[in-house]
A protein has these predicted regions:
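N-terminal signal peptide c-region/cleavage motif recognized by signal peptidases
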Residues: 14-16
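Non-catalytic cap/lid and distal C-terminal segments of serine-dependent acyl enzymes
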Residues: 20-26, 30-65, 70-360
Length: 360
């Protein structure tokens, strides 16, 4: 009897300790923060019972904000229409504070990632995306870049051509392999026989100076290209080098290609122009376009400008740029691969169009 009483007392003493480990369940335990509904709309959800306001920001349709309502269980819900298929960055804004989705399975460096539809990840042989660090001679610092190598590269004896693919303003070298889905897009194109094997280098075009375009172009020539050619089994002549960039990266593309036409055969300028706010004639003269037009026309196998349709914020500037370059004797092609404005939906479509044309 005495032993039974001691055991009962021990069980009673343990109850408060057990209660500390057994928290009350909440709707957040099983919450799915994003759901694609049968009609194509996306439902955003976040558990924030004490919040006063919730919104969502990111690569979402402009002019049609997602409106959230709070349920009695503390879950805020909002419907987004018009996304289409693809990969999108988003963040919740809770009481004015931007927060990443704590339940997102994929995240970029500064935002969560949502995949609508099948996305780009398919059952095909996949290449590798590696982070590499190099020393920049002109910037005098260690810098990072990403490199995509095709499936089977490790066993390949032959040398491959190289595409240098540059992001836009406000992003970095993680953007193309992240929200740009570059690795997956390239995997699929190669598996479908739509492009030749190549290496794709995604450098960091962001430099903390007032005008980062010229120093980045110098970094490309003096450090990035030599680093790649010293560390990868690549062809090292202009016929097997391509450069492409979006928005700010498009300005960097023109800066390096127009100043060094002897280094590249393929040049793609995506949603970009000569420096905004500057006289196009003066910028073209600074880049010696008229002086070198004959050399570039003969040396470039492709010079292509693209836009995301009239809603692309670079649309008018690009029109002015093309008019000036044409006046200065430079030949180029122009296309609109997607009517998605100044967005990653446009630039992913550009990459899907661009890559199959290279090194043929």
């Amino acid at each position: 009897m005495k032993r039974l009483l001691i055991l009962s007392a021990a069980c009673l003493l343990a109850l408060p300790l057990s209660a500390q480990w057994m928290r009350q369940p909440t709707p957040n335990d099983t919450l799915q923060s994003t759901r694609t509904l049968p009609d194509g709309k996306v439902l955003f959800q976040i558990y924030a019972p004490e919040a006063q306001t919730v919104s969502v920001t990111g690569d979402l349709p402009w002019g049609n904000p997602v409106r959230f309502e709070k349920a009695e269980n503390g879950v805020w819900k909002g419907l987004c229409d018009g996304l289409g298929e693809g990969v999108f960055r988003y963040s919740f804004v809770v009481d004015g504070v931007r927060v990443q989705d704590p339940k997102a399975p994929l995240s970029a460096e500064q935002a969560s990632l949502l995949t609508v539809g099948e996305g780009y990840v398919k059952d095909v042989p996949h290449g590798a995306v590696a982070q590499r660090y190099y020393y920049s001679k002109n910037l005098k610092q260690m810098r990072r870049l990403h490199v995509w190598t095709p499936a089977g590269y490790e066993k390949t004896a032959g040398k491959l051509p190289v595409l240098y693919l540059i992001h836009g303003g406000g992003d970095n070298d993680a953007s193309w392999p992240g929200v740009g889905a570059a690795g997956w897009i390239l995997d699929n194109l190669l598996a479908e026989g739509k492009m030749v094997p190549m290496i794709v280098v995604m450098p960091n075009g962001t430099i903390p100076v007032q005008n980062e375009v010229p120093p980045f172009a110098e970094d490309m020539v003096s450090s990035i290209i030599p680093f790649i050619e010293a560390n990868y089994n690549v062809l090292q002549d202009k016929d097997h080098r391509a450069v492409a960039g979006l928005s700010m990266g498009g300005m960097e593309t023109m800066e390096v290609a127009f100043n060094h036409p002897e280094m590249f055969s393929y040049v793609w300028v995506l949603s970009s122009s000569l420096a905004p706010g500057q006289d196009p004639a003066a910028e073209s003269a600074r880049l010696k376009v008229k002086e070198n037009a004959r050399k570039m026309n003969a040396g470039f196998k492709a010079l292509v400008f693209t836009q995301g349709g009239p809603t692309d914020i670079a649309y008018r500037n690009c029109e002015n740029t093309r008019a000036q370059l044409k006046k200065d004797g430079l030949r180029f092609d122009y296309m609109e691969n997607a009517q998605a404005g100044h967005s990653w939906a446009t630039w992913r479509a550009d990459l899907q169009t661009l890559a199959p044309t290279l090194f043929r």
